[in-house]
Amino acid sequence: NNAELTANGSEAVCIEGLNSLRLYNSNLTGNMSDDDQNDTTWTVILYQSMSGDSEVGNSTFQMDGGTITSKNGGLFYTTNTECTIALKDVDITYNDDSEFFLQCTGNNNQRGWGQSGANGSDCNFTADSQDMKGNVIWDSISDLDFYMTNGSTLEGAFVNDESNAGNGGDGYCNVVIEKDSTWTVTGDSTITSLSNAGTITDADGKTVSI
């Protein structure tokens, strides 16, 4: 609570396996360097490395109020685990080269995070009174439930990227937009199901495929 947390040479948060972090009215900054061993670069990661030093289970990140500053890479990355991410009224500063808001996929990490083609993520993401920008990337070996509540907004696209999904699977991306929440579609999007009581808007003719 009311913490100042700054990582000058790494991601801001790394949660592995059955562990959790809850922040209230805190300021979080990450500055991870690009690394050829990784498939991508991130600010917050929820994952399972299979090194044996962390019990397998649901990883949880919850943040209520405060700020996140991302100085390099995408924002949230989850792979080879089950996880819960909940954001409420967090002020987010993105870097100019941010590749995603959330990536929920398998991986081909050179450190060996699970079996390639079977190491996706099962992610429950909830935005509460939360403004968000950037793409949400998912694949067919992952399960993503993405909830927008209480006036949350997203400016971005839902992108199905099978680069790290091997032969694929039966995964999904379910999107729920509650009343007073808004998704502004900035790129052609693919999702599995949509429940919309809010608003979906697009000024550039982008498509949403379900």
Segments predicted by a language model, with ranges:
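Glycine-centered low-complexity coil/loop motifs and glycine-rich tracts
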Residues: 5-17, 30-33, 70-77, 81, ...
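Short, recurring structural edge motifs at helix starts
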Residues: 9-12, 44-53, 72-75, 111-113, ...
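Extracellular beta-solenoid/beta-roll
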Residues: 116-119, 123, 129-210
